[in-house]
Amino acid sequence: MNVTRLYFRVAGTKQFARYVHKYAAYSSTSFQKKKSHFPSPATLDHPDAGEDAFINLRNENYILNAVFDGVGGWANVGIDPSIFSWGLVREIKKVFNNSDEFQPSPLTLLSKAYAALKKSNTVEAGSSTACLTLFNCGNGKLHSLNLGDSGFLILRNGAIHYASPAQVLQFNMPYQLAIYPRNYRSAENIGPKMGQATVHDLKDNDLVILATDGIFDNIEEKSILDIAGVVDFSSLSNVQKCLDDLAMRICRQAVLNSLDTKWESPFAKTAKSFGFKFQGGKVDDTTITCLLIKSKNYE
């Protein structure tokens, strides 16, 4: 089965690569919503990534990337799951744009945004996973926060240097930030502080891949390594195009795998580990953001 380029939307942030500090970074995002075969309308106030949402932001000192997966179960009670995930994006953008007033961190950004979203009364109900990375262009440190079963990888020298672990309450029920209807009782009280925070010292040519579970449920880490391994990032004039193509290729492969009913997908393996029978891929919204680090020697 062939999947054409039109099935995918790519948001490449062409202006990310600026040698203001010791490090620069290039970023690109690719996504496809489930049961969709055409690009979303340009008139939307945000990209139509289904229940997923994402962020690519920068200022003079930091680069912020994040992915969110709105929990689809809310659709069963007539609530659009994307309203919550994109609501978080909206509030995080506000907080990040005012981050000169405080020392930013993924935990601070998400905590302030989540609190603001709850106070805004713009979301009746909903929930979402969250995975944020904040890259410091001055010292090369990547601060992260992952809550739920979205996540990120750090690829270095052709190997997985780090893979964030998933946080789940039970099978197919990830940790999630939520707003519940007033008449709804929830036993869970999950907040941003329950996410796993890490710090990593990044190096030249490190590749950071953030993705929702639509990616990780349908493509093995080794396959991601294989796809990334054939990309040549040595020429600065061609880096952005290569990164755009990489994000799209991984997204495309995950979507193709999700439609294969015969293979043992990562999701199928996880299901079996919990005692459930499942075969094939898992059709879902797929969102991936790639961040490539480049350093400059000022000696």
UniProtKB/Swiss-Prot annotation:
Any single GO BP term: positive regulation of ubiquinone biosynthetic process
GO cellular component, one term: mitochondrion
One GO MF term: protein serine/threonine phosphatase activity
SUPFAM superfamilies given in the database record: PP2C-like
InterPro entries linked: PPM-type-like_dom_sf (IPR036457), PPM-type_phosphatase-like_dom (IPR001932), PPTC7 (IPR039123)
Domain PPM-type phosphatase intervals: 35-293
Highest taxon, organism lineage: Eukaryota
Signal peptide positions on this chain: none
Function: Confers azacytidine resistance in high copy.
Protein name (record): 5-azacytidine resistance protein azr1
Organism: Schizosaccharomyces pombe (strain 972 / ATCC 24843) (Fission yeast)
Gene from which the chain derives: azr1
